[in-house]
């Protein structure tokens, strides 16, 4: 999710946040009609079944009207069964009780949640990186987002042959929208076209699969080659967001993309609220994608660092948190006395080091009674005549204030760990440095300063989890660890739409900088596609396992739950290692059915979701789903406990290999962990062997999870799985 209207609650970040807004309503008689999604599971296998006719018959039956014109909004008929309709509350209740209907839920509205990052992860340009060009060219990434700018050089088809034969999609991008042999498909689900008006969709698509484009920068900042993980792959774009991202549009995109023939789906969209799987459009669509061999990669969200803020919770999703790479952008402030301070900003304005007078917001108040609010640069409290031509100093910063008050630049206190783009030169300083500016301002008769153009700095402490990245634990399935993985989401330079100005004016740029889990999500999706180019027959769960078990381990950068596995899952994605994991944890569709039964879904609901006769005679507790990580929530603290995890691994490394287990306790952990058997001898490829992990302790810390890592090693491969045991009651943070 990026920030700037998509998993983004921040000024210039786009992340696709799923906001629950009011649903569409049409007045009819004494009851309002609202738009509802009627989900009916998989399509029946009968040759004579016509989905739309069935959907119309249902509407006629419940509406009890001679005409139902305008009632049916859309039908899902390609990859799963369902429809969207305008219903009264009583009609909704009747539909929900009908045979064959899994769930009926309101059509919510969403908003969107953004290269050095690939070099940082070892996926470098040129001959040093192993590639499988022919398979990569046959790989199709489906991008569910706000559209795309098709003319971007990142999506040029120079050197590309025709689309893969498996492609069954179309180019329905609208008027003056042209696809090519790189951008092979486009659809949109609202009036208009598939063009991107915010820059978010263009940005995410180029991160995952954009061409290598040399000499790109944001006004000279971050100059280099921008590229995706799999630049030879194809892109199909599904514009599900046009202002908001509606549930019905997302389900339509899944319905189309599955039938179109995509290999990976990246969706930097999410909700700020948690819903059960049968009412979550991303979970529903991704389940059907998984059953057809397609992995869905989803942004974790940008509502951190609160615990239990993550909403991408289904185990068949690869849920991606956001972390730093080894590059960030800074904007220095040089005070009149020569002192230099380093702040955060993506500042493309070059004032050539010229110093301008400083004015503190409080000193520019319209009146004495407004001095307090002027400290925060509240617009209605500032006298524009006292601000014009000066550098405005604010306790906090509202991006448009300094611009509208005609300041030449701005300095403000900013404790965040990410930089924003603004419409004039700014620098956000940490508290101590900001206090230095105030002290200098008060001590000088004519205080002045210069705000310098941003520059890149590189450092060795990456990766670190970012504060805005949504955290676990999982409040739907407490024994499934979320997020799964983390990837770069800080200040990512990628392609931009020429309909979208980073300054919210007419200054359009071809490449821009964004931050958020919207940016980390396509990084992970690109890695998934990269892995698939070497293992085209691997299932979604095998690809997911390879990414998770080869991840770089992460260390705590903060205290509390916000800096544990609930922040970063298995660790930071490692593209090269993920192509050769040694062992994988595979989860079949049947396993997921047993998992849903173990969650007390009744067999009728599971059957309707799966389209198969499911008796629920087999149930898997979430703790024993063959997941690459292991997590258990216990009741109470300071108790003795024993928990077990049953797992099965498949050999994808080499035949005649012996894996020995090793357990590494994390700092402060008092867990006792036993693995049985402790040695796995694999004679052949694709051989499966099972083991049990038993975890015990005499007490648990009530404020922190206890964790360890299980590592299976044959001397070449190190297959690592986090083990997390925790207590405490968690609820989703308030969205207010």
From Swiss-Prot:
Carbohydrate attachment residues: 176, 215, 223, 555, 602, 638, 646, 656
Active site as annotated: 145, 200, 518
Keywords annotated in UniProt: Autocatalytic cleavage, Glycoprotein, Hydrolase, Protease, Secreted, Serine protease, Signal, Zymogen
Signal sequence residues: 1-25
Residue span, Inhibitor I9 domain: 35-112
PTM comment text: The C-terminal propeptide is autocleaved.
Domain Peptidase S8 positions: 117-579
Domain PA: 355-437
Example of a GO cellular component annotation carried by this entry: extracellular region
Top EC class, one word: hydrolase
PROSITE patterns per the UniProt record, alphabetical: SUBTILASE, SUBTILASE_SER
Propeptide regions on this chain: 26-113
One record GO biological process: proteolysis
The protein's name: Subtilisin-like protease SBT4.11
